């Protein structure tokens, strides 16, 4: 009986530690991203942004599409910095 209790206690501890380690590694994987280096061809007026306005629209639309896909919705259009997802689900 003591052996069974000891084994179950060890199993719970190992499971808990494994869960914590996996959660930390998943969070670290999500926060790691590459930051594009600033090019010397960027207009100094846009240097604080790091992208041209057209690039910002593309990035916004990519983030909008990702957001809609996470919600399992379609993206009908992406204009004027407004992100709208459709009401119907992706098939």
UniProtKB/Swiss-Prot annotation:
* Signal sequence, start to end: 1-19
Q: Which residues form a coiled coil?
A: none
> Highest taxon of the source?
Eukaryota
**One GO BP annotation of this record:** defense response to fungus
Q: Where in the cell is it found?
A: Secreted
- GO-annotated cellular components: extracellular region
Q: Which UniProt keywords apply?
A: Antimicrobial, Disulfide bond, Fungicide, Plant defense, Secreted, Signal
Q: List the disulfide bonds.
A: 61-78, 64-83, 68-85
What main location does UniProt list?
secreted
Tell me the protein family, please: Belongs to the DEFL family.
Supply the name of the protein.
Answer: Putative defensin-like protein 221
Q: State the organism of origin.
A: Arabidopsis thaliana
């Amino acid at each position: 009986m003591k052996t069974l209790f000891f084994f179950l206690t060890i199993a719970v501890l190992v499971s808990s530690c494994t869960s914590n380690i996996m959660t930390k590694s998943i969070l670290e994987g999500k926060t790691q991203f590459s930051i594009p280096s600033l090019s010397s061809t960027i207009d100094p007026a846009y240097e604080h942004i790091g992208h041209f306005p057209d690039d910002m629209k593309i990035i916004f639309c990519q983030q909008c599409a990702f957001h809609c896909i996470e919600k399992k919705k379609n993206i009908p259009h992406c204009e004027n910095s407004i992100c709208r997802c459709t009401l119907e689900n992706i098939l």
